[in-house]
Structures are given as structure tokens and as C-alpha cells.
Amino acid sequence: MPETNPFKHLHQDNAKEEESESSLRSRILAKRVTLGVFVLFLLLFPHYAPWEPSYTQSNSLTQQIFTLYFFVANQTLGIVHEGGHGVCYILHCPEFITMANGTIFQLLFPGLIGYYYYKRGNLFAALIALFFVGFSLQYTAWYLSTAHEGLILPAHKSFLGVDAIHDFNYMLSAMGLLAYESLIAGLTRFVAYLIMLVAVIGMFFDAFPNQDKKRKVKRRWGRGKKDS
């Protein structure tokens, strides 16, 4: 007769538990490394974002990395922004909504990604998306701060490379708020930083969960139950 091991299922359970623990440790490590990257990004952001007041230009490697990043990010946001306008052109929205829809899409894009991951139970990924909502809003704050330059956005400043209407000059003028452009841009910048900070704090608590004691208690309880 073939030999059977009556304790085989116990070995399998232990192997699965070890694999689960190893997988959990790997995920936590990945989260902590990612958190470190975002903390560093947030600390350096005011010095290397080309539209920030404290921006200082240099030829350092860090500057070049940020320049490349902002180029890619701005192209992505630009495509989404113009897509928002495009939807309104197709649907024949009122002119004010058409002007606003570019920024709405630009903020909704990372926001909906965050909502998707949140509904799937992936809080860390949702917080990363929330961080980019703040990043996108920071870009919006800069765009707001240029509203005083005029209704017509010159081709060399336009994403599409042609003369265009400045969204915020149009909207602020329509609401009689153009004189308060600096205040509105400043408040928007503050909210953007607040969102990014909240996202990073959330990542920290998710990357450093206080579950070690709970796991130990669970293991002891499980062993005690088997012994009894």
C-alpha cells in the first residue's frame, strides 16, 4: 500500500501561510518604497515645477528628471484637457461649460481612476490617483494665474499650437472675478498641496499598518484552538 502522511494537510497549510506572509511582506515593502518616492517628489516639487514661484532653473540631474516628468505629465493632462473641450464641441454644450469642461476632465481623469481602485479595495492605488488629482489641480492653479494675460492664448503657449481662448480669462471675466485671479489661483494652489499631502499621509498609514500584534494574537489563538 502507498504510504500516506496523515499530517500532510498541516504541512500544506504551513506552506500556504508562509507564502501568504512572504507575499504580504513584499507588498508592504513595495508600498514603502513607493511612499518614499512620493514624499521625495512632494518635497522637491516646489523647487522644480516650472510654474511654481520658488522654481529655480539648473542643469542638475534632478532638474533634468523633473523636466522630463513634467513634459510627459503635461502632455497627458493636455490631451485629457482638450478631450474635455472636444466632448462639448460634439454635444454642443453652452460656451461656459465648454470652457470649463477641459479642467473638469483633467481633474476627473485621475479622480475616476482613484474611485475605481477604491471600489476594488486597493486603497494604496486609490491614494496614488488622489495625489495626481492634487498634481493636476496644481497645474490648474498655474493656468489660473495667467488669466490676466488676455482672452487670446497665443499659438506658442497653446497645447494645440494655434491661437485659442484662455479658459480662465473667459470664465473669470464672465463671473466678474478676473480682478481676483491671484487670490483664486493661490487658494487653488493651497488646496492642491493639501490634497497631495493628504494622499501621502494616507499612503504612510497604509504602508505602515499596525497589524503585527493582531497577527501574532491570531496565530496564538489558532494554535490554541488546534491543541484543544
Residue spans for each PLM region:
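Generic low-polarity alpha-helical segments
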Residues: 1, 7, 31-35
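Short, Lys/Arg-rich, polar N-terminal cytosolic tail immediately upstream
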Residues: 3-24
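Intrinsically disordered Ser/Thr phosphorylation hotspots
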Residues: 5, 53-59
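Generic preference for well-ordered secondary structure
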Residues: 17, 60-67, 121, 155
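Short helical patches
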Residues: 17-19, 65, 69-73, 214-219
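Metalloprotease/metallohydrolase-associated module, dominated by Zn2+-dependent proteases
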Residues: 21-55, 94-228
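Short pre-active-site segment immediately N-terminal to the catalytic Zn-binding motif
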Residues: 58-78, 92-95
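Active-site recognition of the HExxH zinc-binding catalytic motif
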Residues: 74-90, 102
